[in-house]
């Protein structure tokens, strides 16, 4: 069984790491290079950087931050936020990223996933999906499930999250980064039903995201949600737990991890 990964997530805006609740109420968490170096020392398997307002603000890529981080950190870096084209993938890989994450751009132009995957390999291409459980009213007409949101969670696309994940994997995504908007920042645990539904539907790794409040939540994402990796932010940023403590806990739960 492959080792399961713990991935701290750094949401970046205005050159700073921030953390919010349900995609709003942002709170400063520090300097991205300093925080990345700390996680590198703690034994994180990877890091994910998301420029959370790049698409909605129409901003360019955070290349200068990635270059600074890549000069000090020697674990895989995934970068998302404002990634729109195959050329953006090239620029980020040249800056030191190992993977690039598409979100809104894949919704606007699904072909970009095929093109980027064909040019750079599926292992470099992550599709991030921000999903929210349908309201009771919507569920009555469309059935229970989750819709995909774009533009930093501001716009409901009306697409079914499981169907979209399946299409993205088919088009060449090497991983799915799956965030529950309902759970984001709430510390109430992953949406395990969502995680399991997507994990069962696709044949590429799924990274569970949104809602981690304790170490059991991380283990549950793997064992109950079927995720291949778990992503968390606030429990690590504010010093509640270290990555090493998280790995030790997961190992005690019988999950293979790299110590």
From Swiss-Prot:
The keyword Amino-acid biosynthesis applies. One of its GO terms (biological process) is L-histidine biosynthetic process. It catalyses: 5-[(5-phospho-1-deoxy-D-ribulos-1-ylimino)methylamino]-1-(5-phospho-beta-D-ribosyl)imidazole-4-carboxamide + L-glutamine = D-erythro-1-(imidazol-4-yl)glycerol 3-phosphate + 5-amino-1-(5-phospho-beta-D-ribosyl)imidazole-4-carboxamide + L-glutamate + H(+). Transmembrane segments: none annotated. InterPro entries: Aldolase_TIM, His_biosynth, HisF, IGPS_HisA/HisF, RibuloseP-bd_barrel. It is found in: Cytoplasm. GO terms for molecular function: imidazoleglycerol-phosphate synthase activity; lyase activity. One of its GO terms (cellular component) is cytoplasm. Pathway: Amino-acid biosynthesis; L-histidine biosynthesis; L-histidine from 5-phospho-alpha-D-ribose 1-diphosphate: step 5/9. The keyword Ribosomal protein does not apply. The active site is at residues 11, 130. It holds the Pfam family His_biosynth. Gene3D superfamilies: Aldolase class I. It comes from the Bacteria. Its main location: cytoplasm. Its EC number is 4.3.2.10. CDD domains: HisF (cd04731). Keywords: Amino-acid biosynthesis, Cytoplasm, Histidine biosynthesis, Lyase. IGPS catalyzes the conversion of PRFAR and glutamine to IGP, AICAR and glutamate. The HisF subunit catalyzes the cyclization activity that produces IGP and AICAR from PRFAR using the ammonia provided by the HisH subunit. Heterodimer of HisH and HisF. Belongs to the HisA/HisF family. This is Imidazole glycerol phosphate synthase subunit HisF. The lineage of its organism: Bacteria, Pseudomonadati, Pseudomonadota, Betaproteobacteria, Burkholderiales.
